[in-house]
């Protein structure tokens, strides 16, 4: 995968738009397995600048998308006129709309939100393959519980795991599960699911 990026506060942010991003994920789904994608905004970019540990987490992603308007705006002002904002909820909808046979797994949010999301997605995207949905406990999982959760995700055959735990928790979770989860993990934020219901 050849990626064009713009360095913002020491973090490489992907120069892209929605169509390019969807194509990038679809065409490289096998290469992306076991990896993760961060959906960055000003808050997470500044946090990565100020916290070396969180910077490592962000920098280790397959790529960081410009969810925040100021990030794509900065890229445009610094030699990348094609840079556009790619938000988590919009990326989800764009991928759901494609009849590409990919299986989606949803990790995070409440049982109620997930049930409503499942209902809405079935109505709007009847072709969409939902491999599973889970609302993990708010507390940290034990090692055994975590292994069980990973086994459950992998057994589902999910291609894309949407991680909605909120920043920085979701990025740290994806970093810890790199090469353990078989699909590509995309951190979209806890509110992304509610945007879709």
Language-model features: locations:
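Conserved small/polar residues in nucleotide/adenosyl-binding loops
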Residues: 194-197
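N-terminal nucleotide/polyanion-binding subdomain common to many enzyme families
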Residues: 1-85, 89-90
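Short amphipathic alpha-helical segments
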Residues: 50-51, 77-78, 118-119, 173-176
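A contiguous pocket-lining binding segment that forms or flanks enzyme active sites
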Residues: 145-182
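Short, well-ordered alpha-helical microsegments
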Residues: 22, 114-115, 169-174
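Conserved beta-alpha
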Residues: 72-152, 156
